[in-house]
A protein has these predicted regions:
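A generic structural signal for secondary-structure junctions
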Residues: 28-29, 533, 599
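N-terminal leader/targeting and pre-domain segments
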Residues: 1-496
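Transmembrane alpha-helical segments and their cytosolic interface motifs
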Residues: 488-532
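Hydrophobic alpha-helical transmembrane segments of multi-pass small-molecule transporters/permeases
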Residues: 454, 514, 577-580
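Helix-to-loop transition at the C-terminal end of transmembrane segments
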Residues: 530-540
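Short secondary-structure junctions and interdomain/linker hinges
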Residues: 52, 462, 466, 482, ...
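Pore domain of cation channels
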Residues: 523-525, 540-600
């Protein structure tokens, strides 16, 4: 009686098993199996006109398999029916170059052990590579996809989608262990790369996304290139991580972009890019240099963002720009232009934030900015009359040379006794200027005086006359120093007039100085009268004589002159006359200074 032959254990397969095996010739996972018998089974499938689809599910294609066995039954490598390679294992080199899949193509959980070639392939129906493993180099160069799924696919070697065209594609949770190249690819509909991971270099140069692209939660561990890419619709990078340098240079974003909570661990280069609509970078972290050189923004939101060594030079913000609560650790906005509201409320600064030659054409709020040893560079900055720098902001090392600071509202700003420009110039004259301070140091005292004048005008404009008076005092001090830059010149002699104003009345800002000098003058003349015996004093007590001298000095200084005590010699008359003139001057000076202060 002949031995009974069993059926293949693979689910849904009715073929006979091989001797000493549980599987048929198609599903037997042996590379030395009978290739001729295997080819005959392939040909049966290809010749079966009744079958709804080409069924290669779970097939094991040995290394010696030649895909011409399939193509000899097709016209121009065109699969007119659906084809199913689900869970198939390819030990042979896979050659679908130029193939056309008119219906559904299913490669879910397939394993490709060798090189895979889909160059120029056309997938006209649904295409599924979900969970597939590509252990060899995968070529999809020039391939066209209608609806493609690569969810959870693993690419162990290089994969090339250069010049590929996708109507809609999903790479969710895909894992790229080596280089992935999508250069010049076109995504006509939605493209999902959510939670994908790129272990090495990934290239999206000159890629075009016609609809939304989604890279949310994606991890880029290698160099990442989106240079010259065009995003016609919105793009999402929310919670993405860039472990190495990322290049978005010359990229065009035509709709809203979402970079919320993105982490850039290395340099991020967005220079010369265009953001046609809004851009959202809130809560993102740029842990190394962030380059936004010569970028064009519409609405830009960098709220709560951390920026280290960020470069926004020559950048244009066409609409509102929000940097509220951002953390700056060395940021340059030199030559940037803010056409609408710019908000830096509650941000914090370490190292430097530079607005050199920056233009603020609308509201600029630099309020309650935190930081101590930071440098704020507003040199040559063009402020609008809707600018406010204050609310507790520390201006210990702020620079305003050449700016329109007279338009700024500095309410509650924290100014030092001497502004940074003055301290730098003092250090220069004492030979103590540090190398990194040289570029910020003013040329002369006149430049510093101009800064004080503008700060004075700014505080006068907003009703803070006390602070305005302090800046006027420093302005006059710097003017005096400017006159003394060349010794024994005409200006040098003029500077002593400033010295008189300083020590007599504090340049008209210190009535207390006038009172102090008046008291000193009265006591000084009292001693002069006493020791020169130039007035008629009565009594033998030295104290009594001094009090009489002080009394006479006081009434002479105030030009009252009761006559009960009078000079008795020429020296006394000269002293009395001098004191009367000096008293008249100081009384008038006190009235002027006091009235000036009170009228404010």
């Amino acid at each position: 009686m002949p031995e009974k032959v069993g059926k293949c254990k693979y689910e849904g397969c009715n073929r006979k098993v091989l001797p000493n095996s549980k599987y048929c010739i198609c599903h037997e996972k042996r590379d030395d199996k009978d290739i001729e018998a295997f080819n005959r089974e392939i040909e049966k499938i290809m010749q079966d006109k009744e079958a709804e689809f080409y069924d290669f599910r779970g097939f094991y294609f040995p290394e010696s398999f030649d895909f011409e066995v399939i193509y000899r039954h097709l016209k121009d490598r065109t699969f007119e029916k659906s084809v199913n390679f689900e869970k198939a294992i390819f030990y042979s080199v896979v050659d679908f170059k130029g193939a056309i899949f008119q219906k559904k193509a299913d490669f879910n959980f397939a394993i490709f052990k060798r090189r895979i070639n889909f160059k120029g392939a056309n997938f006209e129906g649904e295409t599924h590579f979900d969970g597939a493993t590509f252990e060899g180099i995968a070529y999809f160069t020039g391939a066209e996809f209608q609806l493609a799924y690569f969810k959870g696919a693993i690419f162990s070697k290089k994969v090339k989608f250069i010049n590929a065209k996708f109507k809609r594609v999903n790479f969710e949770n895909a894992f790229f262990q080596k280089e992935a190249d999508f250069e010049v690819a076109i995504f006509k509909d939605e493209a999902f790369f959510t939670s994908a991971e790129f272990q090495e270099r990934v290239n999206f140069k000159q890629v075009r996304f016609y609809t939304e692209g989604n890279f949310g939660n994606t991890t880029f561990k290698g160099l990442t290139y989106f240079r010259d890419a065009i995003f016609e619709k919105g793009v999402i990078f929310r919670n993405a991580k860039f472990k190495e340098m990322s290049d978005f240079k010359y990229t065009i974003f035509k709709e809203w972009i979402d970079f919320v909570r993105v982490v850039f661990e290395k340099k991020a280069d967005f220079s010369f890019s265009e953001f046609k609509k809004g851009s959202d970078f809130r809560y993102s972290r740029f842990e190394e240099k962030a380059d936004f050189w010569d970028v064009e923004f519409q609405e830009a939101d960098f709220g709560y963002t951390t920026l280290r060594q960020a470069d926004f030079r020559y950048t244009r913000f066409r609409k509102e720009a929000n940097f509220g609560h951002a953390r700056f650790q060395g940021v340059e906005f030199d030559y940037a232009v803010f056409e609408k509201r710019a908000d830096f409320l509650n941000s914090s600064v370490t190292k430097i934030i530079s607005f050199y030659n920056t233009g603020f054409h609308d509201t600029f709020s630099f309020i309650d900015v935190k930081g101590k040893k930071h440098r704020l560079d507003f040199m040559d900055t063009e402020f609008s009359d809707r600018t406010r720098i204050g609310g507790g902001t520390n201006l210990e090392r702020a620079l305003f040379s050449g700016s329109t600071a007279e338009l700024v509202d500095f309410t509650d700003a924290k100014f030092p006794e001497k502004i940074y420009e003055e301290r730098l110039l003092e250090k220069k004259f004492h030979g103590q200027l540090e190398k990194d301070e040289e570029e910020y140091c003013p040329e002369n005292w006149q430049e510093v005086s101009t800064v004080y004048r503008k700060l004075k005008q700014a505080h006068q404009r907003h009703g803070d006359y006390i602070k305005a008076g302090e800046f006027f005092y420093r302005e006059m001090e710097c003017k005096k120093k400017a006159l003394r830059e060349k010794r024994f010149s005409r200006e040098w002699f003029r500077s002593f007039g400033y010295s008189f104003l300083k020590y007599s009345c504090g340049y008209g800002e210190k009535p207390g100085t006038v009172i102090r000098n008046s008291i000193l003058a009265v006591f000084g003349f009292a001693f002069a009268y006493l020791f020169s015996n130039s007035i008629n004093l009565s009594g033998n007590s030295a104290v009594r004589k001094f009090l009489q001298s002080l009394y006479f000095s006081t009434i002479t200084f105030t030009t009252l002159g009761y006559g009960d005590i009078h000079p008795i010699n020429d020296a006394g008359r000269v002293l009395a006359m001098s004191e009367a003139v000096l008293g008249a001057i100081f009384v008038a000076l006190f009235i002027f200074v006091f009235s000036r202060k009170m009228m404010r």
